[in-house]
């Protein structure tokens, strides 16, 4: 049976149209989550429909803070510790494929951040001073 060039072109086009969605679904399924503070904007979590279901790890003296970044530990009683031995435990959050949820009162633009220490509000990729967090 001979196939004309036109038939082959239609066959190739149909195969591409059918295989492209399959390829995209496969790639999306292979994407792993990442630590809530080190994902690129619009990156891994943007395609992940699962919301964080676990609290971020405790850190700091006597575990009174919470991890809000790979080397950042914040708490109401301790402020924010960055790059200190007490914040080193926060590196373990990077090993988890599931993002964690930072606890604290909502703050920031459109209430997308959380108060993590006295006067400090952290959003997805940055922390700043915020009078709502007092």
Swiss-Prot record:
Record-given protein name: Terepressin/terephysin
Domain description: The cysteine framework of the terepressin is C-C.
Annotated organism of origin: Terebra anilis (Auger snail)
Compartment(s) of residence: Secreted
UniProt lineage: Eukaryota, Metazoa, Spiralia, Lophotrochozoa, Mollusca
Stored Pfam families: Hormone_5
Keywords: Cleavage on pair of basic residues, Disulfide bond, Secreted, Signal
Tissue note: Expressed by the venom duct.
Residue stretch(es) of the prosequence: 44-50
GO molecular function annotation: neurohypophyseal hormone activity
